């Protein structure tokens, strides 16, 4: 039987489109995260937006990697004129036509894992989708508060036991990717084993 584990994982980077409250280092950290995604032989999947995901996409392209953007718009004109979103640093943009909440669902579901950087409400939405879908999740710690908010959400939801083996926290993008790739590979092996027993 042919091995179905795809050699290039799709890593979603979720983060704030507006980064003013994220601290001075946020853009450099996002760009380095993008570079590390390529160094880990992965593809970046992101919301075809500005801010944290944009700088991650920039890092991916500087390292010669692939970026797939998922837009809330139904087409390029709406993407640029209505949503005021960029098209550069993306190899492919998929126009979902489902606004932000629908885009977030498709974007997250299309990924093998999700990395959460500095974010706002949309980032929390993408995190909760990944959480409920039992995706491997990497929380990038930094001078922002998103990582602390997510820890508090998990604690207050009394669901920490469910995710202790699926969420990793790390401030170094390289180490975060190392840990996240391990989770993806474990997740893929578990799914493959389950499909043989079904």
Predicted regions and their residues:
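Short, hydrophobic/glycine-enriched beta-strand segments
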Residues: 9-16
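Conserved phosphate- and dinucleotide-binding cores of soluble alpha/beta proteins
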Residues: 109, 113-161, 165-166
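C-terminal amphipathic helix plus adjacent low-complexity
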Residues: 182-198
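A short beta-strand-loop structural module common to alpha/beta enzyme folds
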Residues: 43-49
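Short acidic-hydrophobic, aromatic-tinged amphipathic segments that line or gate anion-handling sites
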Residues: 93-98, 164-176
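Acidic/glycine-enriched connector segments
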Residues: 5-7, 19, 27-35, 50-118, ...
């Amino acid at each position: 039987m042919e091995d179905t584990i795809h050699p290039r994982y799709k890593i979603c980077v979720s983060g704030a489109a507006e980064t003013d409250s994220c601290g001075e280092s946020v853009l450099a950290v996002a760009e380095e995260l993008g570079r590390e995604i390529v160094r880990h032989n992965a593809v970046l999947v992101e919301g075809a937006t500005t801010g944290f995901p944009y700088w991650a996409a920039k890092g991916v392209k500087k390292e010669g990697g692939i970026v797939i953007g998922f837009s809330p718009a139904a087409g390029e004109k709406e993407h640029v004129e209505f949503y005021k979103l960029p098209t550069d640093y993306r190899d492919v943009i998929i126009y979902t036509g489902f606004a932000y909440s629908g885009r977030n669902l498709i974007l997250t579901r299309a990924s093998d894992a999700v990395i959460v950087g500095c974010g706002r409400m949309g980032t929390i939405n993408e995190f909760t989708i990944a959480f409920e879908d039992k995706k491997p999740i990497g929380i990038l710690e930094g001078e922002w508060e998103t990582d602390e908010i997510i820890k508090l959400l998990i604690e207050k939801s009394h669901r920490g036991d469910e995710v202790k083996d699926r969420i990793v926290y790390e401030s170094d993008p390289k180490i975060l990717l190392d840990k996240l790739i391990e989770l993806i590979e474990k997740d893929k092996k578990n799914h493959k084993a389950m499909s043989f027993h079904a």
